[in-house]
Amino acid sequence: LIKKEMYKNDIAMISVGGLSFKRYLELAQKLDKKVVVITDNDKDYKKNITDQYADYISSSIQVYAPKEEDQYTLEVSLYKCNDEFLDKYLQTPQMRNGTQDYMLKNKAEAAFRILNILEEDNRYSEFNIPAHIERAYKWIS
């Protein structure tokens, strides 16, 4: 999906949460900057995506989240797209409740371990990007 570093496409990624999030969108509207939001649907796409961002969607601002409500957060989306891969390379005997549960309860650690698996073993071609993230990247590029 990503053939070169995002900065070479003049794309910057920032993580924004809480109350400041909509302020960034308001700023982007005023500056007429192209912005893509990748977010969770939190089990209610209509309420948390369609309704919440209706005032911001435009030709320069788009919001992407999984439409499937069972993919309510990034970790679940990643697992659903890569269950066999993650169960094979990430799971350990200590994960009594399964790989997805581990990913949800240890987000930073899971992300770090996945990145290490991809980099150290050069397994990028085996890893699937969730569809909403792929669509977002294609739109912003």
Predicted regions: what they are:
Residues I2-S141:
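Acidic, Mg2+-coordinating catalytic modules of nucleic-acid enzymes
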